[in-house]
Amino acid sequence: IREAVSAFKGVKRRFEYKLVTERFTYVDDYAHHPEELKALINGARDMFRGKKCTVIFQPHLYSRTRDFVKGFAESLNLADEVILLPIYPAREEPIPGVESKMISDLMKKSNRVMENKASVLQWIDEHEPELLITAGAGDIDQLTEKITNTLRNK
């Protein structure tokens, strides 16, 4: 048992460390509900006190975004800076008027809505995110390797 526990690398996409250096800490997580985001951000802030926390969040499902928009805004306000990607639809058709900007409009913290993933990579290349978190249940995980490489090459 001891050998198995020591070899356990954790659960993929649950507070998964993608890069840890003196300058950057990058974590990826599957969080896609306001309570999960709240726990994720609070946990990261506790572990990395004093580091500026930037969250890149991709909402998952139009209906969930509509139903929990206030909760998402409240949870994301716990970060210092937030970048919102477009909603990942999964199995749903778009709901008129439901978009990531709904969350952004309710937030008090510095935030921006990016139209695509390439914009996120450009932003990371131009900034110095001390504690970076990507979160969401959509296809945001397809960005993790590119983000890691962008940070590693700074």
Label each residue range with its predicted role:
Residues 32, 59-61, 88-90, 137-140:
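Short glycine-rich anion-binding loops that position phosphate/pyrophosphate groups of nucleotides
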